[in-house]
Amino acid sequence: MIIKEEMYIRSLKRKRHIDIYVPDDYQSAKKRYPVLIINDGQNAFFDEQSYIGKSWGFLESVRELKLDVILVAIYCNFEPLKREDEYGPWVMNQEFSREYDTHRLVGGEGNAYVTFLTTQLQPYLDQNFPT
C-alpha cells in the first residue's frame, strides 16, 4: 500500500510530496520494519512519475524479494536549481555555479535538508508507523 503525504519542511520553509510504501499487513503485524529513505522519490515507484519514463523499480524489487520494509520516497524540489540547493551541503563556487547558467551561487541547504530528515521526518515515521 502507498500512502501519499504532503509535509512542510520546517528547516527549509517549503512543502514536499512524500510517498510511503508499507507492507499490506503493517497495521496488524506485531513487528517493526526497517525504513529506506529514497531521495528523488518521484522516480522510485511509478513509470509515469519518473523523469525518464521508467521507475527505479523499488516496488517490484520489494515484492519479488518478499522484503518487509517501509519505503519513504521524498520527491525532489522541482523549482529550478532548488534540488541542487537542498542536496548540496555547501555553496558551490562561482565557476561551478556558472555550469548551471545562473547568476547566483548554487547549493548550501544540505544541512537544513538533513535536519529535516533527522529531526522531523524520522520522528514522524517512528510515531506513525511500526519502525
Where are these regions (language model features)?
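Non-catalytic cap/lid and distal C-terminal segments of serine-dependent acyl enzymes
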Residues: 1-131
